Amino acid sequence: MLFLFQDPLGDAHGLAYLYPQAALCREAGEGYADLTALAGEVREGELVLKLRLARYPNPLGGPLGFSLATALVYLDLVPGGEEALLPGLRTPPGQGWEAAFVVTGFGVERKSPEGKREAVRAWREGEWVVWSPGLPPGEYGSYGAVGLCDPFAPWYLRPVSPEGGAW
């Protein structure tokens, strides 16, 4: 294994944010946007990335076995790069990203800072969502975020609100 970052279970509320209150979300319970691990390993000379969520409810029938969460994984491949992540979030100066991966229960998409998008091969291995980013193994920086899936948002990530709300 190249790396394994683990995150404590049960910290998916960020700055005291509430999960949506729509029936679909209430029935799923909480914890489905709780990232518990991100890992990278080498398989047959190629980098493979993996993430694990606390829970995988799938009321919308996502082929990867979940449908309510979106995870974003940004990789810093070379010096420089795009420093803007999400609104209000930036990388340290000079440590921007060159490849981002949007992970939903409906697939994984690679995005470039210029806006290019392409689907990448993804699958499940037990509790892990696994994908092949098409990169050689290397010493890359990484940034991540997890939130609620919004299929209409540019990064499939629902804007957060301290109030909760239906969606």
What does each model-identified segment do?
Residues 1-5, 77-94, 137-167:
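Acidic/polar low-complexity flexible segments
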Residues 2-5, 9, 21-105:
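Surface-exposed, glycine/proline- and aromatic-rich loop segments on solvent-exposed faces
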Residues 95-126:
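Extended, solvent-exposed segments with strong compositional bias
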Residues 128-135:
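Exposed aromatic-hydrophobic patches
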